[in-house]
From Swiss-Prot:
Gene this protein is translated from: thiI
InterPro entries for this protein: Rossmann-like_a/b/a_fold, ThiI_AANH, ThiI_fer, ThiI_N, THUMP_dom, THUMP_ThiI, tRNA_STrfase, tRNA_sulfurtransferase_ThiI
Gene Ontology BP, a term: thiamine diphosphate biosynthetic process
Disulfide linkage: none
PROSITE patterns, sorted: THUMP
Family the UniProt entry places it in: Belongs to the ThiI family.
SMART domains cross-referenced by the UniProt entry: THUMP
Protein name (Swiss-Prot/TrEMBL): Probable tRNA sulfurtransferase
Length: 385
């Protein structure tokens, strides 16, 4: 008998038709990369994936964070004869100390002499005969579910052996995006959600030295590292933004500062994406959350983008965003009290219904191309693996 990890991938991958094999290959590749320094063996048994290793805890901790994996199960492999199956089933139920149980069987090996229902009945009957009054069958609400997978070999486990994974689609299968990463709660969650959909994720942070400290930059670097735990690696571009902000403050009206700064952030992200061959932009904006995130404000920001702009948090409540941030371990870092460029130079009464034509007129006083190119030319690059 061997203890293995059964890897179950997202059911959405089954719906990919002729592309299903590409998604499976990419997912296997990503799993192997995560386990590159852990001795392991990848086993396929009639379209089921299993991982064998002496360090099962280490494997679980890493693979559960691989996008595309929806669940891991710690299973016991037995020979494909009924006696081995029923004995292991009895052992699992005893270990669970449950007072009620149910058996579910998946018989992929059609050469096995019993069908799925017959296996479930026979294993359940054997457990009842051995444990007597200590336990009962409850098919509707059992304390423990016993699972039997019959393939080339047989695999036995319970619902207590299941570990929830992140789900989503294999990272790197759905293009690329540049995330406008701040030090707040929202943008790291947006980065995570895009990566979870298989989008290769890069980040840009706008640093306003000396108005924002090095600790603010370090905070954003830490957030990028945390998001990078779920990806193969992540690149963070730190763009100096002070000169742009000061020029806007000097030449534009106070109530237009926020939206013009947002338009410059979008321009920088687009130009950087063009240089790095990245296909889209992602922001952490949520409709109505702050003054600049009105429908009109978002339209004015989009006006300067030459590529798709994704806002995965657009319809989410703040509490829901915070819950995800806690789940992915970015929350505690995000709430550290260091200001970023979005929280300084904020006007008392920002425009909530800006118009594109007004912004175009206001920006005529600014040398847009020179400001954008200079900021990108002076940026820092950090790669976290």
């Amino acid at each position: 008998m061997n203890n293995l990890i059964l890897v179950k991938y997202a059911s959405e991958i089954f719906l990919k038709g002729l592309n299903k094999n590409k998604f499976e290959r990419k997912l296997k590749e990503n799993i192997r990369k995560k386990l590159k320094d852990i001795d392991h063996e990848f086993i396929t048994d009639q379209n089921r994936w299993f991982i064998k290793s002496e360090d099962l805890d280490g494997v679980i901790e890493r693979v559960k964070k691989v996008f595309g994996v929806k669940e891991l199960c710690l299973v016991t492999q037995v020979t494909g004869d009924f006696n081995s199956i029923k004995e292991e089933g009895l052992k699992k139920i005893k270990e669970s100390k449950a007072k009620s149980f149910k058996v579910e069987t998946n018989r992929a090996n059609k050469k096995f002499p019993m069908n799925s229902m017959e296996v479930s009945r026979a294993v359940g009957g054997y457990i009842l005969s051995e444990l007597g009054d200590e336990i009962e069958v409850d098919i509707h609400n059992p304390e423990c579910k016993l699972y039997v997978e019959i393939r080339g070999n047989a695999y036995v486990f319970t619902d207590k052996d299941k570990i929830k994974a992140v789900g989503g689609l294999p990272y790197g299968m759905n293009g690329s995006t540049m995330v406008m990463l701040s030090g707040g709660i929202d943008s790291p969650v947006a980065a995570y959600l895009m990566a979870r959909r298989g989008v290769e994720t890069h980040c840009v942070y706008y640093h306003s030295h000396p108005y924002t400290s090095e600790r603010a930059k370090d905070k954003v670097k830490e957030l990028a590292k945390i998001v990078g735990r779920y990806t193969e690696k992540i690149t963070l571009y730190v763009v100096p933004f002070t000169e742009i902000q000061m020029d806007i403050i000097e030449k534009c009206r106070e109530d237009e500062l926020t939206i013009i700064m947002r338009r410059f952030m979008m321009r920088v992200a687009c130009e950087l994406s063009e240089r790095k061959k990245i296909q889209s932009i992602t922001t952490g904006e949520s409709i109505g959350q702050v003054a600049s995130q009105t429908m009109e404000g978002l339209m004015v920001s989009n006006d300067v983008s030459d590529r798709p702009v994704f806002r995965p948090l657009i319809a989410m409540d703040k509490e829901d965003i915070m819950d995800i941030a806690r789940d992915i371990d970015t929350y505690d870092t995000s709430i550290l009290p260091y200001e970023d460029c979005c929280t300084i130079f904020v006007p008392k009464h920002p425009k909530t219904k800006p118009r594109v034509k007004d912004m175009i007129i206001a920006e005529r006083k600014l040398d847009i191309e020179a400001l954008v190119n200079k900021a990108i030319d002076e940026m820092e690059t950090f790669i976290f693996e």
